[in-house]
Amino acid sequence: MNKNTLQKDTNGAATELGYIFTFLLGVMLLSMFSMWAWDIETATRERWNEQAIQANLDDIAAAVERADEASRMGDVQYSESVYWRATEADENQFILSLTNEQLILEDSAGSLDLEVSISGAGSGQHSGSVQLSGISTIWIVHSEGVTSIQLERPQ
């Protein structure tokens, strides 16, 4: 004789709940890992961006120093092009200014304002201000006793 009786079996439900909790734990761990990896990538990109901008300013300051050295030779004209390394910053907001003591980068957004000191040991004045929107080359020019920065190649 074959008797069919229903039995209350909770083992299957416990297994299903275990699958669900394991899945949710995996989703949570992957989400945390994704946020951690994104944070590392963002911090690295920002650091590289700041280092590229600082290297650009250092290159321009070195070119200004070379123009000052040429100005001490007498009535000479000197020009040098400096390549502006590409950055991820919004360079439409950047204004680069040259004074007698400093090379100043002004960022309208305010997060990347930088200054590089220069010796000012040339025989003339320093002047110039350029907007860095879409440029790849900056010219350092010493002519008629003035060292300046400009975007156009001198004639």
Regions found by a protein language model. Give the residues of each.
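Broad hydrophobic/π-residue packing in well-ordered secondary structure
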Residues: 5-7, 18, 68, 92
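A broadly tuned preference for mixed-charge, low-complexity surface segments
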Residues: 2, 25, 151-155
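C-terminal juxtamembrane segment of a hydrophobic transmembrane alpha-helix
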Residues: 15, 19-44
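N-terminal leader/signal peptides at the extreme start of proteins
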Residues: 1-13
